[in-house]
Amino acid sequence: MDKFRRNGKEDTFRQRRFLYPLLFQENLYAIAYDHYLSRSSSFESMENSSYNDRFSFLTVKRLISRIRQQNGSIVSFGNYNQNKNKLVGHNRNFYSELVLEGLTVVLEVTFSIQSKHYLEGMNEWNSFRSIHSIFPFMEDKIPHSNFLLDIRIPHSTHPEILVRTFRYWIQDAPSLHSLRSVLHEHRNLILSENLDQLILIASKEKTRLSLFLWNYYVYECESLLVPLWKRFSYSRSLSYGAFLERTTFYRKIEHIVIFSHKSIKDLKKRIWFLKDPSIHYVKDRERFLIALRGTYLLVKKWRYHLTNFWQCHFHLRSQPYRISIDELSKNCFSFLGYLFSVQMKTFVVKIKMLDDSFITDPITKEFDPIAPTTLLIGYLAKERFCDISGRPTGRLAWTGLTDDNILHRFDRIWRNILHYYSGSSKKDGLYRMKYILRLPCAKTLACKHKSAIRVVRERFGSELFTKSSPKERELISLSFSKTRSQRERIWHSDILQRNPFCNSWRNKQNLQVETPFDR
């Protein structure tokens, strides 16, 4: 890919942005074929592996000649009745996939060059791969905020809208017509028919191009909104004249800022906002969380402007229900499988002076992450480890496994739950999860050996989860310790994948966001 990027002459991309000639280079389709082969080897059966014998540079030259003969479209393989005569002796799916991969390589190379300047400005941000790395940031910043905007990115858009956004950095008309043809022929790349998947791409059609389109869609949102938030956050305060009452002056000066910009007639206009020096933003897939410190009027203005942003920039209909407002002091919110709330804590402080001493009780805000016990029980019930009320049941399907395999499976499920929810401030729910998993493990072993649960416990011991390493046992003891110094939240730096429960919970929440009008 780097060699192709060097041979493509980056200066030509920056000055002219002509992409269509790249579609006639043989090296491009060699790269595309390599991507297609690696993906097909993972997801397709061995019957379709005969594509190895079909690829040759002679085939590529024939494909390029077919592309040259196309009128207004590179890809017209969607209608088999119109193209079966053209593709005699060749697999039309192979041609279609190869052209799609080739177009994706061109877009990825050009997009990486175009976004280099934007990405250079983000190098100063600390980047961590672990999912838990975002929680210390939220723990440090969100308690200083008053309101939270919970935003769901609109999950579908018209193909022509994406073509219009690509016109900002693709200037040659043939490339735009080619992209328009691909998006209209393969609408399943951008329109999800599955209501459980409220994102830009359908789960069964996750191609390299569909992932690129989703990332570009999110990039467009962030590249326009993040600079606006930075400008608003770093804005200067307004200098007032003399006020009769200095207390009122300081209260007003703290919450008011001014923006100055030139209009079409080069006239300066002043737009007044309530100042918000605390704007924090996190994202997970199709979901944005924006924490604000200010009044309810300010938050309503932000929701109004964000709704207009999607309506004007992406030509989507107004969807204010996708942006909910939560007051952090009264409501809790969910994110990445956790339930979060901001609790008001009071503590007694004794201040001793030379001649006197007094006691005060200051109020502080504490970030409180909680493992959702009820929803975890619902997930375990769905996996048939217990019923909906939390009563454990055995896994009869596992009775054909060995004892070590059964113990290992239950132990792995328990360790995954404990590892992911080690940052929970309340461990009672994790105690219950451990009990729910221990009893099904004993019931499964008892059913396999046709004995009682008491006999199984006497044979394997009261602690059925015996596969944990010494370090993991030490971590478990620290997580459930009763001393205050050892009850601190533990965030791990090695969690690279979401807990399966998070995905099921996210799908359930997305279904609740949907309205009959969308369906």
UniProtKB/Swiss-Prot annotation:
Pfam families: Intron_maturas2 (PF01348), MatK_N (PF01824)
The keyword Plastid is annotated on this UniProt entry: yes
GO biological process: mRNA processing; RNA splicing; tRNA processing
Primary residence: plastid
Xref: HAMAP family: MatK (MF_01390)
Job description of the protein: Usually encoded in the trnK tRNA gene intron. Probably assists in splicing its own and other chloroplast group II introns.
Descriptive protein name: Maturase K
